[in-house]
Amino acid sequence: MGFQNEASSSSYTLKIPPPAREDSPLLGKGPPLSSQFKTFANVFIAVVGAGVLGLPYAFKRTGWLMGVLLLVSVSVLTHHCMMLLVYTRRKLDSFNAGISKIGSFGDLGFAVCGSLGRIVVDLFIILSQAGFCVGYLIFIGTTLANLSDPESPTSLRHQFTRLGSEFLGVSSKSLYIWGCFPFQLGLNSIKTLTHLAPLSIFADIVDLGAMAVVIVEDSMIILKQRPDVVAFGGMSLFLYGMGVAVYSFEGVGMVLPLESEMKDKDKFGKVLALGMGFISLIYIAFGILGYLAFGEDTMDIITANLGAGLVSTVVQLGLCINLFFTFPLMMNPVFEIVERRFSRGMYSAWLRWVLVLAVTLVALFVPNFADFLSLVGSSTCCVLGFVLPALFHLLVFKEEMGWLQWSSDTAIVVLGVVLAVSGTWSSLSEIFSVKV
């Protein structure tokens, strides 16, 4: 079923998507946002996540100046591609008397490319959301393994390390990840997000608190000591840094719901630009301060550099609890897609358990948090954030866009594909290389 564009010379056929559940776990079905400030705040909440904790380590690898340039470039490109999605939906809505039937990224894929478009979007949403959750488990396992004193024979880490090495043949980090598994089976068996919604507020508060503590600690350390730092780490690390930057700004799934809920839609682009600019400044400050404070000793999770004080321990435990409860929120769109395709949209506990097990197994084999951020950013986030928005925009506007617009969309598609392929290869090489 489709609507023909009769008011335009374009022969594009709009495919009306069937009713579908939202693909983004970040937004509920609450009342429409009525102010620009609320939209700004929601952009911040949707984009800023645990990936920020890996930025200082990424700056150590790439050099602080290259890191800044990559963050700014990715921020500008991400905003542009988000707006391409908005423009594409507005164009398709104009074919249907201005009534929007496109509520999510998957709906837009269906409207532009039919079932194939939805399948591609769904696939990369599954990979990206599951990738985020793998990162969460890596963070939890690594952080808990580092919190206790390994030299103390009575410490929890010592007992876990001895148990793992002598009896099970696995590390304490792996045991902590396995320890999360049965509890995640229970949390991910909850049918609706309604009961988990308050946890998203808690997660945002903990994230902001952790960032504030780290920035203060970094500033105090910088005043006492200034380790040697480098501006450029070499072009060989460009793809690595690009992957981490793309991961850090991933939030393309929220842009269409946010634009729909904003009262003054004409100002959405400006509000989104302000939000992305503000986030960029925070990311740059966080990354530079962390690197300046610890130099070559900067760890892949910056909170691990804070030492063993009470404040540091509370922050790290708070982040672990935050990510532990954020896990089911981020897996929810994966469950919706898989259940829609394999159980006719009906709730399926065993499908959810299989997916949680798969995510857990992947987390066990990834040694480094920041390296995995680069992998997810280079692979799925590049496709979702750059390739698909530009491709959909190109297909819908191809008969009325000028040469400059056509070249811009085509260049973004090509750039996204090149970054995805080369960045994925580079990240996998980093993960599986033997580091001495």
Swiss-Prot record:
Name of a matching Pfam family: Aa_trans
Entry's localization field: Vacuole membrane
MF-aspect GO terms: neutral L-amino acid transmembrane transporter activity
Positions of the UniProt region annotated as Disordered: 1-21
One GO cellular component term noted in the UniProt record for this chain: vacuolar membrane
Cytoplasmic side: 1-38, 87-118, 188-195, 250-273, 331-352, 398-411
Bilayer-crossing regions: 39-59, 66-86, 119-139, 167-187, 196-216, 229-249, 274-294, 310-330, 353-373, 377-397, 412-432
Coiled-coil residue windows: none
Stretches assigned to the Vacuolar side: 60-65, 140-166, 217-228, 295-309, 374-376, 433-436
Keywords carried by this UniProt record: Amino-acid transport, Membrane, Transmembrane, Transmembrane helix, Transport, Vacuole
Bias type Polar residues, positions: 1-13
Lineage top rank: taxon: Eukaryota
Gene Ontology biological process terms from the UniProt entry: neutral amino acid transport
InterPro entries: AA_transpt_TM
Membrane topology summary: Multi-pass membrane protein
Membrane found in the keyword field: yes
Tissue: Ubiquitous.
Protein family (similarity comment): Belongs to the amino acid/polyamine transporter 2 family. Amino acid/auxin permease (AAAP) (TC 2.A.18.8) subfamily.
Protein purpose: Translocates preferentially neutral amino acids from the vacuole to the cytoplasm.
Name of protein: Amino acid transporter AVT3C
Organism: Arabidopsis thaliana
